[in-house]
């Protein structure tokens, strides 16, 4: 058994132990994941269901979603994300997602086959992937703890999502410091590698630098006025 397979087996056993009411060993699963599992369970997330409760259909019409997405501040960074990341992963089995501050998926781009597969778990534009809605996952956890995170296979709370791995990091407004959304990479085993999280962090850093550069002249003008 490879090291990766051994780790996955250990995590899966811890997950099953946790769901059955047990207390997995501290070294069986990362504390950030264990805490997220606990919040997911307490919040009533069904571990057997990966569908985000029909939220995209119940709260926004297609026209409302299109208008909301177009006006959302994270949409302004989409061209930079495309040039830094999306173009490079076109046929790699990976997708890149941009969410809003609530975990709603605003844009999903990348490998078309991977997008089709992701649709089976409702990882589609318009659906909500917050921790409260779908349980432990990288976009939702990044929003919950306001830091970059990687969630690998059986670390996901919803069983149907456990064939996927994801890495995500929050994007902050340069003026307020508030989180405006998340940049996420989702795929298979390749996203379980450390470089996936490093790549997301690098892209978010570039996005926040560019946003800060655009804000600086407005700050100086405000001071002069």
Where on the chain are the PLM-derived regions?
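Short loop/turn segments at beta-alpha junctions that line or gate ligand-sensing/allosteric surfaces
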Residues: 131-136, 142-157
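A short beta-strand signature within small-molecule sensing/ligand-binding domains used
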Residues: 161-170
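Fold-independent oxyanion-binding glycine-rich loops
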Residues: 101, 145, 153-155, 169, ...
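A generic local secondary-structure boundary/capping motif
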Residues: 85-86, 139-140, 155, 169-172
